[in-house]
């Protein structure tokens, strides 16, 4: 089963989580991981996966409406609160192709996560393990063996991001040399 789940989630991006029920008619609250709420109304079908239960289901969105900081969604065939309860905690995954193509100089986190990072002399530094949003600029967390290096994503330090090759060339910050 694990192999099948991995295959199912290949090329999929976590978009949000079904956190709780809303009302008695099977509606659910969807909190987004993404800063692209405009995509919610375009979703027709998605994969919902709950890692702790090791369960997945293909869901069809029939109604969506905005609430305060979340969306209320109705999924086809989920018409009671007891049916909706079973989907609490499921993460909604969308195909990468569902997202608009990123522009030059911009990137989605999934495009640079696990990218190889090299300095401008071609020396391997590590793999992008995480991305921290600071408000001013992102910071990539690069892991090499047991060491972590934090590199601000600004022109001074990031020389090139090759999203296709999953490769980033950096000018190492002075404090790390």
Curated annotation (Swiss-Prot):
All copies of domain PRC barrel, residue ranges: 104-176
Species this chain originates from: Fervidobacterium nodosum (strain ATCC 35602 / DSM 5306 / Rt17-B1)
Family as reported in the entry's similarity comment: Belongs to the RimM family.
Entry function: An accessory protein needed during the final step in the assembly of 30S ribosomal subunit, possibly for assembly of the head region. Essential for efficient processing of 16S rRNA. May be needed both before and after RbfA during the maturation of 16S rRNA. It has affinity for free ribosomal 30S subunits but not for 70S ribosomes.
Domain of life (superkingdom): Bacteria
Gene (name only): rimM
Subcellular location: Cytoplasm
The keyword rRNA processing is assigned to this record: yes
Record-linked HAMAP family: Ribosome_mat_RimM
Domain-related comment: The PRC barrel domain binds ribosomal protein uS19.
Entries under Pfam families matching the protein: PRC_RimM (PF24986), RimM (PF01782)
Assembly and binders: Binds ribosomal protein uS19.
GO terms (BP aspect): ribosomal small subunit biogenesis; rRNA processing
UniProt KW rRNA-binding keyword: no
Identification of the protein by name: Ribosome maturation factor RimM
GO molecular function: ribosome binding
């Amino acid at each position: 089963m694990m192999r099948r789940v991995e295959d199912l989630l290949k090329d999929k991006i976590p978009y949000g989580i079904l956190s709780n029920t809303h009302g008695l008619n099977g509606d659910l609250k969807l909190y987004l991981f993404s800063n692209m709420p405009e995509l919610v109304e375009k979703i027709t079908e998605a994969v919902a996966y709950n890692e702790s239960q090791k369960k997945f289901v293909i869901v069809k969105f029939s109604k969506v409406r905005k609430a305060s900081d979340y969306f209320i969604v109705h999924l086809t065939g989920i018409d009671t609160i007891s049916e909706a309860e079973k989907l609490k905690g499921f993460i909604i995954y969308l195909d990468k192709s569902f997202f608009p193509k990123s522009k030059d100089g911009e990137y989605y986190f999934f495009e640079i996560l696990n990218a190889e990072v090299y300095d401008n002399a071609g020396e391997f530094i590590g793999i992008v393990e995480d991305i921290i949003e600071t408000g001013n600029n992102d910071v990539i967390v690069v892991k090499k063996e047991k060491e972590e290096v934090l590199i601000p994503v600004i022109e001074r330090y990031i020389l090139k991001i090759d999203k296709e090759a999953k490769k980033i060339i950096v000018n190492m910050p002075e404090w790390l040399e």
